[in-house]
Structures are given as structure tokens and as C-alpha cells.
Amino acid sequence: MELEPIADKLQSAGLGVKAKSIFIHAMPVECKKGILLRSPLQGTQIDHELPGYYKAQFSVICRSHNHAEAVQLANDATAALKGYNTTVGAMDVRHLLPNHLPVVFPVSEGNFIEALVKFDICFSM
């Protein structure tokens, strides 16, 4: 699935700037506070029962030096993205929903905290 419209939505919500604090597929180590969007390797499922509909998952990973700030950024991203029957870029989204609350990972080598939320999306184009 194309993650660029998701990045645009996060930028429109005031959660960062693409290529400076919102990234797709890889976040540079120099970024001290930011959001990374990643899609799984299996790609986007085609719904053969409903032609033109697709199902996918993607991850939102929020980084900060501060635990509470990383979790808050993940919660803010969740609030900006989740919903039903909306348009995101060229996608007519039936649902875009988080699977869980933020999962916080241990401090990384760069001394960062990262909080992960996985999302399900069902859409047509």
C-alpha cells in the first residue's frame, strides 16, 4: 500500500513535516523526534469477494528521547489517523483502525525510546 497519503495526513494534523520528522520505510538516526511509517513485507491483500477493495496493515513508530513524549506522539498519530468512511489521498477508506495501544521498545543504541502502533486499513481506489 502507498504510505505517502498517510504521511500527508499526519503532516496535515500538525504532527511533523515529511522528510524532516515524518518518514516512510526508514528514519535517519539523526532524527531525535519523529514518526516512521512502515508496511509489512506481505503487501496489500486483494479482496476477491469485493472487487476494487483492499486490506492492508502498516506500522506507526514514534521516536523520542522521552518515554512519555514517544507515547504521546503515538497516541496523537492514532487520533489523527483512526476513523471510518473517509478519504485519504486517492483511497476511499472504509476503516483505518489501531490494533493496540502503543508498545514501547527498550532504549536503542542512540538512546531513543520508540513506541509502535500497528493499524489495519480497508480501502478502495
Predicted regions and their residues:
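Small/polar-rich, solvent-exposed N-terminal microdomains that initiate assembly or binding
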Residues: 1-50, 72, 79, 84-91
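Residue-level signal for secondary-structure boundary sites
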Residues: 45, 68-70, 125
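Oligomerization/assembly interface segments of phage tail-like spikes and tubes
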Residues: 52-68, 112-123
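Surface-exposed, low-hydrophobicity beta-strand/loop segments enriched in small/polar/acidic residues
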Residues: 68-69, 75-80, 100
